[in-house]
Structure formats: structure tokens, C-alpha cells
Amino acid sequence: MALQCGIVGLPNVGKSTLFNCLSNAKAQSANFPFCTIEPNVGVITVPDERLNKLAEIEHPQRVIPTTVEIVDIAGLVKGASKGEGLGNKFLANIRETDAILHVLRCFDDDNIVHVDGRVDPVRDKEIIDTELQIKDLETIDSRIAKVQKQAQTGGDKQAKIAYEVLCKYKEALEQGKSARTVSFDTKDEQKIAHDLFLLTDKPVMYVCNVDEASLSLIHI
């Protein structure tokens, strides 16, 4: 099964443009918010020289490279965790992915609308982070309500472990930290944490959308 990466960010930051570049697709990309409503999906192959070397040795009938599924998800706005914009749908789409490509607009252009009026990639990152953290906190609070009594009054060992995991996540999220910053030592804890499918536990890569004039200023 292919790894699925979701492209996320505020509206009008270049998500569909990135999707088209990666997948060679022709998804609509326009200068207005929520140009994308239903997710666009594309599949790209992953070049791997090791695969070619193995093929030279084994001479298989077919060589099938690894693929990555790229999903262009509708733009998120402040308040999405409470249903603003396409909030609930957007968050459900993210939950289905394995990793996140977070696009940040880092260029000024008066001809391209910014939903918050001005370009500020740090603020934009924090908006997305906060909305995902709030949604994760709702998930944690709901789970705590289900296991707390069982963990505190019963003899269910797994319920006690789950309760401790949930409380650790709750503490971090209430401090504005993402779930991926929390670590667990035992396999039981790690399994419970994994099965929560928290949005902020997914690995994330930040993609900075800059203008051509800024390319010469970038140092890798």
C-alpha cells in the first residue's frame, strides 16, 4: 500500500500548484480561497537506484517501483476545528494520510489574495498547528471520558495504561505542543498512542513557497 502524503496549508498558498508539480496533474489552481473542495489525488513513483541494481541481478519479469500517493486537501482557516470554512471535512481528510506536507506562503504579491490580509509564514504555521492541536485535544478529552472511571476504579491494566497515555498527550496539547513531541517507553504505551491516529502525531515537512527573486537568498 502506497504511503499517502496530504498537502495542507491556508487557502491560496500554492498547495494545488505543488500538487500539480509533484504529480504532473492539472488540478485547478486559482486566485481565490477554497479553489479546492474535494481532495485531488495523484500517484508518483519513487526513483531508487537500488531497485535497478537488484533487477540487473535477478532479472524479474517486471520492476515495480515504490509509489507515494499525494493528496491536495482543501485550505484550512482559523476556527477550522470548530467547523469554520471546510474545517471538519478538511480535518477528516488529514486524518486519513500518513504524513503532512505543510505549504507556507513566503512571498509578497498584491495580485494574489491572502486570507489574513498579509504574508506571515510563522503566523500561518501557528494557525494550522493550533487548529490541529485543538482537534487532537477534543479527541483526547473524549477518550479520557470513556476510560477514566475504568482506569481509576477497576482492575483493568490496559485502561490504566491508556489513561496515562491520554493524560500525557493532554498535558502537552494544552501547552501548545504537538503530539509528535511526546514519547513513550513501553510497547503497550506506543501501541495505544499509535491507535489514537492523532493529527499532530503525523510526520510533517514544511514547504516554503518563495518567489524567484528570493531563490538566490536561500542557503541550504
Predicted feature locations:
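Conserved G1/Walker A P-loop phosphate-binding module
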Residues: 1-78, 84, 88, 93-94, ...
